[in-house]
Amino acid sequence: MTISILPGIAAIAEAYDGFVLDLWGVIHDGHNPYPDAVDCLTRLHGAGLGKDPGQGHSASKRIVMLSNAPRRSHGVIAAMVTMGIDRALYDHVVTSGELTWQALKARSDPWHAALGRRCLHIGPERDHGLFEGLDLTLVGKPEEAEFIVNTGPWRDEEQLEDYMPLLQAAATHRLPMICANPDLEVIRGGVRIICAGTLAAYYASLGAPVRYHGKPYGEAYEACLAAMGLSDRARIVAIGDSLITDIKGAANAGIATLLVTSGIHADELGLAYGDHPNPARLEQACARHAIMPQAAVAAFRW
């Protein structure tokens, strides 16, 4: 399969009514928006405004941000405002943290209902907002806990090896773990750091039970589609930088995919920000991961 490499988002803007946009690696780098991102988002938001939809198509673009941030949606919105990303430029934000919070609040399925109330949080203090309003008691040791919420390493410089003793101890107690960020790693300000998904994968390898919320799992995309209010999946595209979360998840949900190549796979592809990808090298990388997007673009630019 040949992957089309597009000059920018304008090339597909008219083909779709709904856009599911990844944040980290597409819109921003964890600290600042990418050079072209705000301009592109502004143009995309305005691309359908005031037009006659015709044939059942939407008169304005539906834009939903889908992030594996282990924080609630309102916190991610506030962070984007701080970065200078106007709240008026998109419709909704769905985060893995919000999905986690909703699942723990509702406890409407047997797995979550059985978790208990004593929780060991693996993750930095900045993620504590995830527990507000949940009637949980946070504890500090596996032997005190009934389950684990994993939002990632306590410090960016830490590696999996730093957590192996803790995770091994938790596994002996068969503590269920919720992974509130399935990403394995992320690049923050040019530095590659591990995410909660790396810790969860190791914990699962010990035979311990793990439940994931976020991409690439189906509930994340169903939440986006519900927020959009669009029924025709052929008119929806997901734009992301990770083959194993963004592209895989969207493909499984039956929506089109566009890979941004200057994100998490940039080193693998030998690219700096905005570099045009080599088609053969891109297809080789996709083959290694056994995931093929319909198209690719160097950066989220118009």
Predicted region positions:
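Asp-based, Mg2+/Mn2+-dependent phosphohydrolase catalytic module
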Residues: T2-L49, V64-W302
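Intrinsically disordered, low-complexity terminal tails and inter-domain linkers enriched
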Residues: A47-A59
